[in-house]
Regions:
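Hydrophobic faces of well-ordered beta-strands that scaffold small-molecule active sites
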Residues: 18-23, 53-57, 89-96, 126-127, ...
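Structured functional modules or segments
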Residues: 554-628
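Conserved, mostly hydrophobic/aromatic
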Residues: 26, 128, 203, 254, ...
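Catalytic cores of alpha/beta
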Residues: 240-253
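Terminal or standalone catalytic/regulatory effector modules within metabolic enzymes
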Residues: 48-66, 342, 346-555
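Active-site beta->alpha loop and helix N-cap motifs at the rims of alpha/beta catalytic domains
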Residues: 59-190, 210
Length: 628
């Protein structure tokens, strides 16, 4: 307890601390989370000298991506960073409350094992959020993070009320009203207070979509500082153009910690650059205890790494080279920094944003995304919807899908638009627009996740769901919370192809299997088989291979169940020889992070499964052969 009190007073006494996001949120926002361990190893010696208060290196999409795309072990990633950085910076991970890094609510036993292993592997701070801001969903993680000596950083997810259509005179005469605002300053403070009461060591205002305007953060920071006795961190993005101005405003209003990226990974869909924050702090007389010489060395290395990541670079627009320690600012740009400070102090938002945009334009950071700004939805949600519609050759209904977001969101209980609820609402808005286009009633096609959200399995929504709507979507009027007592552990079979070893050999591997069932299964199988083959070097008998090939190329004679959209086969719910009825779910297809139950249009007997679980399939690809 003394250590925790000391931590609080140490943070509260500092002028401004920096949480560097480059190796997690930075690479996830701009480069599809594709940094390899070898690339990370190149910057770690400089990070050891940089003296950031904290470094976000784990969680979010990192554990999934390193297994799925890089064939690397997520636990190794955390342990290798800790081995080099030591105790210079606190290593941070982002965790989704009861869902941890996965998408299902887990039992306390799994949450405890996960927190213990994370902290033993080098984690210092767990940033915990819940997509619904349901405080009950973060309770267990707070408890176990603290039990094993970690720091619990609880995030309040910032979101805004939908833009409802303007009501005409006739609507008003009929007594129609738009819903009252839900996401008020009092709402966010109440969530922060509840988290503090549960033992949060710090609170983050987490704006994942960059939609918080400087004028709003100017209200929230003083409100939090006056009513909470723990440090306040501010996290935002630059996508719609508010990020830099909002961070400057937060610093002026007395925030304890801000989240930044290093220059070549900053701006655009990412967070603001530490180098710009450094200039503002110098002008404001705010102490910033970061070694900017080490930061410049990291940035030089990041330039080369970004070149290597060109194929997955979201903007392909490099900022102009700049080192605040050695490069002189032109007088007119130096003046823009002064104008921004002056405007922030005077609460003149328009002038503040104009100055910040002039600074970003001079350094060639990406321009504000006007579509995201206008639609007021997260950039990731918007790009997911576009990708979904492109795959379905239905870009003509994008506008309709965007229009339907407030309707779908309100019907589902007004969830904040953050992962995973932003994807659930976005995918459902697309489904509804497709229903309308096909002349079907809205909600004819719903994802499993949308059903679970409406049912209550994700937790309490900010406003209650209409029982009649719940009945229509989920088959029940009553809210049914997820019952973790019914949770079933993932199977952990012996791998015959790897000499009979267990798929997951230890607790850390078991946890990977629980959090990422299909991805971890593929990764661990590959690892175990490769290790076994390296030891035994024996080829499989040729005859067996020939038989397997012949079977694979056998022509399809029965009816087939085809993929209605591109996606990945999560699991089959039937096996060869099973009898199926028309309309029965036979396969679960993951598309755009949503699980879709695919039914057969035919009754009969399953002859064979035409693809393996984990396979990526195109639209119209046959998945199952059925003999009628």
């Amino acid at each position: 307890e003394f250590r925790r009190v000391l931590f609080r007073s140490q943070v509260m006494a500092q002028k401004l601390l920096i949480r560097d996001l480059t190796l997690r949120d930075g690479q996830q926002s701009s480069f599809a989370t594709r940094m390899t361990q070898q690339q990370i190893d190149r910057v770690l010696p400089f990070y050891k000298d940089a003296n950031f208060y904290a470094m976000e290196v784990w969680g979010g999409a990192v554990p999934d991506s390193v297994m799925r795309y890089l064939n690397e072990n997520p636990w190794d990633r955390l342990e290798k960073i800790k081995a080099v950085v030591g105790n210079v910076s606190k290593l941070t991970a982002l965790s989704r409350g009861r869902n941890l890094f996965g998408y299902a609510p887990y039992t306390d036993e799994i949450i405890e094992g996960f927190c213990r292993n994370s902290i033993e592997s080098g984690l210092g701070i767990m940033r915990i959020f819940d997509a619904l801001n349901d405080v009950n969903n973060v309770k267990s993680t707070i408890k176990y993070v603290k039990k094993y000596g970690g720091i619990a950083d609880c995030a309040v997810c910032y979101t805004i009320d939908p833009k409802y259509p303007k009501l005409g005179l006739l609507d008003k005469l009929k007594g129609k009203k738009n819903p009252e605002p839900v996401f008020t300053n009092a709402y966010f403070l109440d969530k922060a207070k509840q988290m503090a009461a549960l033992g949060a060591d710090m609170v983050t205002i987490k704006d994942m979509s960059g939609l918080i305007q400087p004028s709003r953060i100017a209200e929230l920071i003083p409100l939090f500082k006056q009513n909470l006795s723990i440090p306040v961190d501010f996290h935002t993005h630059c996508t719609p153009g508010y990020g830099l101005g909002a961070v400057l405003m937060a610093i002026i209003k007395g925030v304890d910690i801000v989240d930044t990226n290093i220059w070549n990974f900053a701006g655009g869909t990412g967070a603001p650059a530490i180098e710009l924050v450094y200039i503002f702090c110098k002008k404001l007389g705010v102490e910033l205890d970061v070694n900017m010489e080490a930061v410049a060395k990291i940035n030089k290395e990041l330039y080369g790494i970004r070149k290597e990541l060109e194929a997955v670079d979201a903007s392909k627009q490099f900022p102009n080279p700049f080192n605040p320690l050695t490069d002189q600012l032109p007088a007119e740009i130096d003046k823009e920094f002064d104008k921004a400070i002056e405007a922030a102090k005077a609460n003149n938002e328009e002038a503040l944003l104009n100055a910040c945009h002039a600074i970003e334009a001079y350094f060639n950071f990406p321009k504000p995304n006007e579509l995201v700004k206008k639609a007021e939805v997260p950039g990731g949600m918007y790009s997911n919807m576009v990708a979904q519609l492109k795959q379905l050759n239905s870009m003509d209904i994008l506008e309709k899908a965007m229009e339907l977001i407030p309707t779908v969101r309100l019907a589902a209980g007004l969830p904040p638009l953050v992962t995973p609820t932003s994807q659930i609402v976005g995918a459902q808005a697309v489904n509804c627009a497709l229903d309308i286009k096909a002349g079907k009633p809205m909600y004819s096609n719903v994802s499993n996740q949308f059903v679970n959200l409406v049912k209550g399995e994700y937790g309490k929504t900010p406003v209650p769901v209409d029982p009649e709507f719940r009945l229509k979507i989920a088959g029940t009027r009553e809210e049914i919370p997820y019952d973790t007592s019914k949770y079933q552990m993932q199977p952990n079979p012996e791998l015959l192809e790897a000499g009979g070893v267990k798929l997951a050999a230890n607790e850390k591997e078991v946890l990977l299997l629980e959090l990422f069932p299909q991805v971890a299964k593929n990764f661990l199988t590959k690892q175990k088989v490769a290790a076994y083959e390296a030891q035994h070097k024996a080829d499989a008998p040729q005859a067996e291979k020939v038989v397997a090939e012949e079977k694979k190329n056998e022509p399809i004679t029965g009816k087939t169940v085809k993929a209605p959209m591109p996606g990945s086969i999560l699991r089959f719910t039937v096996k060869p020889g099973d009898t199926v009825t028309k309309g029965q779910t036979v396969v679960i297809l993951e598309a755009m992070k949503m699980e879709n139950s695919i039914a057969t249009d035919y009754a009969g007997t399953v002859k064979r499964l035409l693809v393996k679980e984990g396979t990526t399939v195109a639209a119209d690809a046959p998945m199952i052969e059925i003999e009628a």
